[in-house]
């Protein structure tokens, strides 16, 4: 990387420096998140959290804040519907802004988990309309049945 070469050459004290880590340490990939009915935690991610309102599963994969856990163990956590539901009628959130703490965000901000939450939000929205319910009061069992029918693992 050119920046490292320049630092070594031009900045006193950097002559023998080495790059050990980068953006994942700084946390610059963090983003705004909602405050949902449930706030997913790092413990949920790392200790295989299970939820009655699960709308999908995701492998134990954390990439950020100087932590790297690759999905090679077969371990997974469930994504609860509550982390998609803010305190606003008929609004669902999917992707990197679901409700969660800093560590859980390092697991849920990637594209695979965005797909899981996006499918769940779409199914829940459609069912809430059919049932004449708000997304906050949708029949979660019906949502789960439809997700399974579509081939999702919950």
Each language-model region and where it sits:
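Flavin (FAD/FMN)-binding glycine-rich loop and adjacent Rossmann-like elements that form
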Residues: 1-154
């Amino acid at each position: 990387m050119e920046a490292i070469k320049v630092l070594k050459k031009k900045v006193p004290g950097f002559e023998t420096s080495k790059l050990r880590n980068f953006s994942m340490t700084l946390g610059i990939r963090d983003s705004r998140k909602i405050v949902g009915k449930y706030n997913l935690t790092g413990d949920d991610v790392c200790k295989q959290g299970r939820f009655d309102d699960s709308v999908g599963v995701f492998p134990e994969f954390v990439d950020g804040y100087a932590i790297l856990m690759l999905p090679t163990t077969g371990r997974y956590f469930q994504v609860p519907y509550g982390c998609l539901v803010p305190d606003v009628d008929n609004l669902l959130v999917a992707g990197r802004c679901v409700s969660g703490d800093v560590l859980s965000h390092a697991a849920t901000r990637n594209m695979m988990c965005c797909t899981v939450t996006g499918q769940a939000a779409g199914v829940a929205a459609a069912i809430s309309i059919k049932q004449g319910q708000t997304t906050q009061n949708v029949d979660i069992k019906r949502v789960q049945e439809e997700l399974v029918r579509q081939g999702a693992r919950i």
